[in-house]
């Protein structure tokens, strides 16, 4: 089984946790990015830099990840495409994407996109701290255990 990472937007602390879990469970990690990013120096980690272009990394992830694998991403439309393909998706803050919550997640994402475009909302998510790391570690452990059972 592989853990895929949308590496352009994934916090370093989350990447470090993924590598730790992968080493412990003997899993492969594939980081996909639209530009060169720092790759942890472990044999289980591979970095793929896709040609630049709108959604090139997303398209690569959707094309190559298969059911039974996990993709770590913050991108809600990407997660929707993965879920429809039967691939598990988790954001770096520990929130799993699934068929039940995708509609709400897409609606909220679209609303905030509109508000930002109108200048009524700014910024993004808050800092990635210990609470977020712990929530991510717990969710990652739970999902990997579920995927290992098949």
From Swiss-Prot:
PANTHER family xrefs: UPF0178 PROTEIN YAII
InterPro entries assigned to the protein according to its UniProt record, in alphabetical order: UPF0178
Lineage: superkingdom: Bacteria
Name of this chain's protein: UPF0178 protein PputW619_5044
Family of this protein: Belongs to the UPF0178 family.
Species for this entry: Pseudomonas putida (strain W619)
